[in-house]
């Protein structure tokens, strides 16, 4: 290969005139250095590689110009079958199966064949020819190490040739291309299906308009129907708002801070008002349910443990009389928390279950309320029949009796 002159050095012409002499060695001849740089010949890196390759081949006793080491030559010893008793030898002392891979050999080393430029320093690893592992005397004498065979199939298959390797390599390449093509088709179908799904919702309105035009032929009527449908929906939601306002008014719950929408309001404003009124109505109802359930439990404890019954194995007689009054005070301060707890419980319940939850505590509390009223009436009647001498004393006794029975 001929040396190639790099013409980029021409750009340095006259550079010595631009240099500052104060920063340059006085003994240096700038003009001479410029001439050396301008006329320097530089070769490609491949030339250095070829020199190393030729030196390695010479040390191994290989001549690239010899037809015996050429795959294209019919007289090549590499393509011949080796002969011998238990030894696989070829010309030059290189075994047939010592330079091979398991399945598909590379272009440079396959089926025991050695192309021009295939043996390089340190390029063949693990069971092949390493730099310095094959001695000069062993190559010249035709002897190599034993046990460098790749696998048992390469030992037994004496007729394994380069064409077989190429055939297997081509088959593997074809199978890989087939696998890639199948995967690409699958991804393409998945992407197309995803794009269709994403397009369908956005074209729903357009499809409705096209169908309407095909049937009626008047686009204005289509938009008129759509406007009428929206107006009807607003009227239904406004009626729901009026019902909620009525319920909250009966419970004496203020709604002055909520702006009531009209038919001209947007759908979003109407939905926001419905949500606020629903939360306010449901919050009161849910807190009432929690209060009734907990007060019912307190009433049950008062009936069971009134100070006369003893707990077995504990020798303890608890008296929970008046516990429901304490519960009422505590629960009134926690109306928001109780409404949240009940709301989470009844969120997924059916309407029938909600009705049972509303009426269940009342069924338990009703007998206790009736008994309290009857007891208050009897005490007041007995007090009036007694007829105390001092009217102020009678008034105080009546007041204390009513206060006691109302607890």
From Swiss-Prot:
Sequence repeats lie at residues 112-116, 117-121, 122-126, 127-131, 132-136. Residues 187-202 have a biased composition (Basic and acidic residues). Residues 116-132 have a biased composition (Low complexity). The keyword Repeat applies. The keyword Repeat applies. Keywords: Late protein, Repeat. Residues 73-93, 116-202 are annotated as: Disordered. Induction: Expressed in the late phase of the viral replicative cycle. Residues 112-136 are annotated as: 5 X 5 AA tandem repeats of G-[S]-[IV]-R-[DNS]. Belongs to the asfivirus B407L family. This is Uncharacterized protein B407L. It comes from African swine fever virus (strain Badajoz 1971 Vero-adapted). The lineage of its organism: Viruses, Varidnaviria, Bamfordvirae, Nucleocytoviricota, Pokkesviricetes.
